[in-house]
Amino acid sequence: LRTGKRMPTKVSEVVIYFKRQPHNLFGDSFKNLPPNKLVIRLQPDEGVEITVMNKVPGLTSSGSMDLQKSKLNLSFSEAFADERIPDAYEKLLLEVMLGNQALFVRRDEIEQAWTWVDSILEAWKQSSEPPEPYQAGTWGPVDSIGLLARENRSWYESKTGKKK
């Protein structure tokens, strides 16, 4: 989970990396294939994208095969180009004007959330290491890259979203 303020783009996405298969169907020459992934874009351009490695149709002259990364992309703004898609706040304001409070949190929920946040703030006060700052307009602290690199992983950096 990565979140922050003043990052390069304003975007909310859920990125799911699928586990690598225990048996490599493509042979030893394709040992380090990137994992397939599913990106669910919540805002600003709602949609779903799945990226998979697949075999290029046909054979090479040597009888080997080639693989390439392919994307299947559903962008609501493209799929419904003739429709006006309301902004998230428009939907929220319409619901409150209609008297539907289902999209809003109650006071007891807010108090419970602050109980959780207060425990985090208290743990930070007890810690000898403060949260690591980062330069505005970047994807976060430099050390966050090393945090994932220790597990041979890397952060997903969104290509969508509104530039700040």
For every predicted segment, state its role.
Residues 1-164:
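Secretory/organelle targeting and membrane-embedding segments
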